[in-house]
Amino acid sequence: MQTLWDVLIIGGGPAGGLAALDCAKHGLRVLLVEQRLFPRWKVCGCCFNNQAQAILNSRGQNNLIVDSGGQALRSLRLGLRERETTLALPNGYALSRERFDQALIHAAIQAGATARFHVTAQVEAASPEYRRVRLKDHQSGATSHAKARVVLVAAGLTQRCLPKHEAGLSDIHQQSRHGAGCVVDDDSHHYPVGAIHMAIGDRGYVGLVRREDGLLNLAGAFDREALSQGKGAIDAAQHVLNQAGFPVPEAVQQGHRWQRTAALSRSTGVVAGERFLVMGDAAGYVEPFTGEGMAWALTAGAAATPFVLKGVERWTEDLETHWKSTLQLTIGRRQMVCRALSSVLKRPRPTALLFELVNRWPAVAEQIISSLNEAKLPSPKGEPCL
């Protein structure tokens, strides 16, 4: 007989992992499926700001980052046109996605969740009591079905888990940049631990941060045209670093392989439907800064539990409406700042003016960073927070 899960979560990133943990701690039967094997690397700045930490603390994971080896971040170093300025960065940490995501899933399993890896999921028909999901195990090749009262879709930027007639259309912003990243072994003194190093160029930007294992993580956002020329991300990154006056790590010069993402800035037409909620990057994304991307994902993961609890008891259209409002109020407002900043960074003259402002009056920039780091927890009752 098929198990009827209270909630089936598609995606083992921060949003899915935290939702699995929180739902399991509330006594729900939780199945999480992830298409890749863990640990796995992701194109990400691997930075956690105060909002991300506050969310983890609120779910009993106060020490998860530190216990996993997280490195404290105290400053943001900016480079533009061979000029530099450094700003204070409040209460940040750097931790590789390999360690963080695995630690979060491990905590969820300890709380009672079931996790399956190298498994893809396709949401199928809904019944009055549950949603049917087709699962494919890519190790054995076997296909099976699962039933869940609620499905959480946290499958990333380009998720295709929902039926076409329910998924809606993703609106990719016309000037959206594309992400690319890599991890390199770099023992130079140019990129010390404890800082986010951000190089800004006319066709993109690159963030560099030293991880807990000493490796250097590079993550950038580039114009599509920049990635289509020469050696793609390798040349695009070197161009940005050279423009900023930042040394190019030797491994990057030697052609170290980069991994690319789809277009970053996008909105999703459908974030909820009959017995499913869309969350994390799958619910819409903007080019993030100073750890905001991780904060958005964790905030969504924490916000989902009260909706799941209500949905397990009885699904209503009000849940779908309130979920959309909750995402807008808890995450959409935070994304507005990053959207405005990314818009400025696409235009050389406003970028230069902003850099001059930051250089002359760093307190103004530090106030903006503080606003991004301001912690706000989602409502424990699943009601929009005004």
Model-derived segments and their meaning:
Residues 2-15:
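Beta1/beta-strand and adjacent pyrophosphate-binding region of the FAD-binding site
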Residues 13-14, 38, 157:
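Residue-level detector of alpha-helix initiation sites
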Residues 24-43:
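Glycine-rich FAD pyrophosphate-binding loop
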Residues 37-57:
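Conserved N-terminal glycine-rich FAD pyrophosphate-binding loop of Rossmann-like flavoproteins
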Residues 52-105:
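A conserved beta-strand/loop capping segment in the N-terminal third of enzymes
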Residues 94, 226-308:
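FAD/FMN-dependent oxidoreductases across multiple families
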Residues 107-247:
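Predominantly flavin-linked oxidoreductase catalytic cores and closely associated redox partners
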Residues 306-386:
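C-terminal helical "tail/cap" subdomain of flavin- and related membrane-associated enzymes
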